[in-house]
Amino acid sequence: MARTPNTDRRQRGGDDQRNRSPRSDERDEEFLDKLVHINRVAKVVKGGRRFAFAALVVVGDGKGRVGFGTGKAREVPEAIRKATDQAKRTMIKVPLREGRTLHHDTNGHFGAGWVTLRSAPAGTGIISGGPMRAVFETMGVQDVVGKCTGTTNPYNMIKATFDALVNSQAPRQVAARRGKKVGDIVARRDGAAAAGATE
């Protein structure tokens, strides 16, 4: 008779765990993740070299939130898992114009790498490659032109891209900072874009 309550608690605990797992899976499915780069690293110890794998992962929700992370482990899957977890903890929110492109052109740099991001009209697509494309795809950007100079290191390219994205602001933020109306900011932006298209 004394074992019955314990058995019931174990059963209820098992049911709770089974009920929790689908919700955690749903949370994971909300994010898109892309493996940008993976390489083997070595640590020199007294007994020789100890090898491990380092992974660089980009995670986004397809609606303007994006983050990147790095992970290191003896096995590739574990390194990717660590990088993915770190990326989810360090996500930033980037305002998108019409849910498809950036509000304005922006620049960023890290180390020797310089990145230029330009907003683009509908139908342009993602004109960028390598690590930068992974950032745009997971973030939900559909039209953008990106260029990176000075480095081919994927880590520096990702950090320079995020430095540029952090500087991206919505018209409402710019208007609040300058003490102007949102309509004036949008009209000036659209006028500059039209002038650039005719040149």
Curated annotation (Swiss-Prot):
Record's GO cellular component terms: small ribosomal subunit
**InterPro entries with a match to the protein in the record:** Ribosomal_Su5_D2-typ_SF (IPR020568), Ribosomal_uS5 (IPR000851), Ribosomal_uS5_bac-type (IPR005712), Ribosomal_uS5_C (IPR005324), Ribosomal_uS5_N (IPR013810), Ribosomal_uS5_N_CS (IPR018192), Ribsml_uS5_D2-typ_fold_subgr (IPR014721)
Q: Does the keyword Ribosomal protein apply?
A: yes
Q: Name one GO molecular function term.
A: rRNA binding
SUPFAM superfamilies the record matches: dsRNA-binding domain-like, Ribosomal protein S5 domain 2-like
**Keyword field:** Ribonucleoprotein, Ribosomal protein, RNA-binding, rRNA-binding
GO terms for biological process, alphabetical: translation
- List the Pfam families: Ribosomal_S5, Ribosomal_S5_C
Q: Where is this region: Disordered?
A: 1-28
Signal peptide coordinates? none
Q: What is known of its domains?
A: The N-terminal domain interacts with the head of the 30S subunit; the C-terminal domain interacts with the body and contacts protein S4. The interaction surface between S4 and S5 is involved in control of translational fidelity.
Q: Which family does it belong to?
A: Belongs to the universal ribosomal protein uS5 family.
Q: Any idea what job this protein has?
A: With S4 and S12 plays an important role in translational accuracy.
Q: Which PANTHER family match?
A: MITOCHONDRIAL RIBOSOMAL PROTEIN S5 (PTHR48277:SF1)
The record's note on quaternary structure and interaction partners says:
Part of the 30S ribosomal subunit. Contacts proteins S4 and S8.
Protein name as annotated:
Small ribosomal subunit protein uS5
